[in-house]
Design a protein with these regions (language model features):
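His-Asp-centered acyl/peptidyl-transfer active-site segments
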Residues: 1-68, 95-99, 122-125, 201-204, ...
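Conserved adenylate-forming
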Residues: 349, 381-394
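Carrier-protein-dependent adenylate-forming modules in NRPS/ANL systems
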Residues: 3, 23, 74, 86-128, ...
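A short catalytic or substrate-binding loop motif that flags glycine-/basic-rich loops and adjacent residues
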Residues: 36-38, 70-74, 164
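Gly/Ser/Thr-rich phosphate-binding loop
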Residues: 367-372, 392-393
Length: 394
């Protein structure tokens, strides 16, 4: 970057002269010497070949003003330099990889660099600007204008504020079942109080080995309201991975249903069926209003963990990643703004609960007053079933 343009051109000229003894070595031979892989994907050609004088000369009243030819190159980008009375540059491109607008931008950037080289050959390479001022403004300012106000409050506070705005609106739709914001909030409050009595609070984890259902959404909200962070567990994961996650995360307990008990049975952690917790809440006449801060085992803050998700482990052992309330709320607000999600929207819970995207879908919907559409996994496979689901859900 500290080298001048003149020094760069001199160095390139010297290198080309040094390599000229090998200019007739075929590409096949070079490929064999280098090994596998593409040698290059951009072709540069300087068409410095002679043109017969009788073609360009004058014969009577007939005068040839220019001679040119066209050929095709099997590379994504090719640049041909055509000498003559004026120097011409011709850019070719694979239309399957680059559209006309992209190719035109390449030409404009090249023109700008050449003009800067001619105007100031002593300028440093690092000072050469390939972007037009308008394009630089667009890339560095407009596209980078991603700052948004972070919603002020924990996820329970933000959700409860939405409940107050739209208590009767549909919050979750699953098959023929629809649950309003008010009812979803009440269910989550009752379950949260049961979880608090079982030791769930800030900085404590609760595993969720639950299928796609309304119960899954209730459980997520209940853990957050209790002050804890949830750990999604895909029951279809290999037993070894599930056991590792649970032993590493050390949750207070794991919430299951009958069909997912087997997935966590060998991990040696306390398990509770969610229906049993519902029954305990009903038998104990547990209140359904929002939890007060004093009911929790500790202080819930915006920087408290909201959930923990494990990496794939493709580069080693899986690692647990903790995401805070403020981080998740900010992400949800950004997605809602980007996709125009509001009270009249319906958001499909498409991603697996064990992937980050599922959390974004849930938060984006429930903090915006939209309806979260939950469906069984077999209806989410590409094909007719998914198309029918999307059409029916609106």
């Amino acid at each position: 970057a500290s080298q001048s343009l003149a020094e760069l051109m001199a160095r390139v000229q010297q290198e080309q002269s040094r390599l000229s003894d090998h200019q007739y070595l075929g590409l096949t031979d070079i490929q064999g010497l280098v090994g596998e892989g593409e040698l290059f994907d951009t072709l540069y050609v300087f068409e410095n070949y002679p043109v017969a004088a009788d073609i360009t000369g004058t014969s009577g009243d007939l005068r040839v003003t220019s001679v040119e030819g066209r050929d095709a190159a099997h590379y994504p980008v090719s640049l041909a330099v055509l000498p003559g009375q004026t120097l011409r540059l011709q850019l070719g491109h694979d239309t399957g990889l680059f559209d006309e607008a992209t190719a035109q931008r390449m030409v404009e950037r090249l023109r700008r660099v050449i003009e800067e080289m001619v105007a100031g050959p002593e300028a440093r390479i690092g000072g050469v600007d390939v972007l037009e001022p308008a394009e630089r403004e667009r890339l560095l300012v407009e596209y980078n204008d991603t700052t948004r106000p972070v919603p002020d409050g924990t996820l329970p506070q933000l959700f409860e504020a939405q409940v107050a705005r739209t208590p009767d609106a549909v919050a979750v739709a699953y098959g023929d079942t629809s649950v309003s914001y008010g009812e979803l909030n009440a269910r989550a409050n009752r379950l949260a109080r049961v979880l608090v009595k079982r030791g769930v609070g800030p900085e404590r984890l609760v595993g969720l080995a639950l299928p796609r259902s309304v119960d899954m959404v209730v459980a997520v909200l209940a853990v957050l309201k209790a002050g804890g962070a949830y750990l999604p567990i895909d029951p279809d994961y290999p037993g070894e991975r599930i056991a590792f996650m649970l032993q590493d995360a050390d949750p207070v307990c794991v919430l299951t249903v009958a069909e997912t008990d087997h997935a966590v049975a060998e991990a040696g952690v306390p398990c509770s069926r969610i229906e049993d917790l519902y029954n305990a809440a009903e038998a104990g006449f547990v209140a359904s209003d929002d939890l007060a801060g004093r009911e929790r085992l500790g202080c819930l803050r915006t920087n408290s963990p909201a959930y923990v998700i494990y990496t794939s482990g493709s580069t080693g052992r899986p690692k647990g990643v903790s995401v805070t309330h403020s981080g998740l709320a900010s992400m949800g607000a950004m997605h809602a703004d980007r996709f125009g999600v509001g009270p009249d929207s319906r958001v499909l819970q498409f991603a697996s609960p064990s992937f980050d995207a599922s959390v974004w879908e849930l938060v984006m919907a429930l903090l915006s007053g939209a309806a979260l559409v939950v469906a069984d996994r077999d209806r989410l496979l590409p094909g007719q079933a998914l198309a029918e689901l999307v059409a029916a859900a609106g």
